[in-house]
Amino acid sequence: LVDYAHKPGAVQAVLATLRAQAAARAEAGRVAIVIGAGGDRDTAKRPLMGEAAARGAEFVVVTDDNPRTEDPAAIRAEVLAGARAVGRADRPAGAEEVREVGGRAEAIATALHWARPGDTVLIAGKGHETGQEINGVKHPFDDRDVVAQVLDGLVTDDADGDA
């Protein structure tokens, strides 16, 4: 699921909905999230984004969003701090360690490869956007295209018997 959720409340709401849907299935699935925060924007929300992700997903991958003119690693560190501050008791049962994968395409692939049938992967923050702004340059990038490419590769791997 690709969603524009780019504020802590939105992340929390989407994850709550996904968790409820997963729990309603005959075989409850797990939830993963790929999340980052934009540069040159509200810095106070970064740890809150990480916290919301960690409270609502078994698997959290912190990555780059639109770093703009800021250091992407510094932005990720702030999101990670919020995610890692959430204690095990406040995370979903079976939650894994929070991961950091700077490259957004690689982060998406990491989450999709983690997922099993019945799981849900939320790619949060960019939604409909078709570019990633880095150092004042907007590079072509669409989460939806990356998801399609990764899933196509997974289907091809399964058909070949390699997965």
Predicted regions and their residues:
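ATP-dependent carboxylate-amine ligase
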Residues: 1-163
